[in-house]
Amino acid sequence: MVLKIYGAAHSTCTRRVLTVLAEKNAEYELIPVNLSKNEQASAAFRVKQPFGKVPVLDDEGFLVYESRAICRYLARKYAGQGTRLIPDEGDVRGWGLFEQVSLFLREGRVG
């Protein structure tokens, strides 16, 4: 079954997930969510994402939301294919640096 990504192609968070999928050479289907029509706030969408945000990953019925969580899930699921995006499990220094940069970028500081 092909992964389904519910999101908006112009959304930064959706694009983050699509970038990871491209780096991992993973097949997926983008299910468009029209943010200008507020589709993410609908009762049907909130079954998938209770906060009404995009993106949402559907992996054979297993739903993951929050773009960074989706990206980590995909990086581990497809660890053996495409670009290596996260450190190995036992690489303590690698994880420390990874988290440091992740937190730094999340706060929006670039210099």
Give the predicted meaning of each segment.
Residues 1-111:
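GST-like domain detector, emphasizing the conserved glutathione-binding G-site
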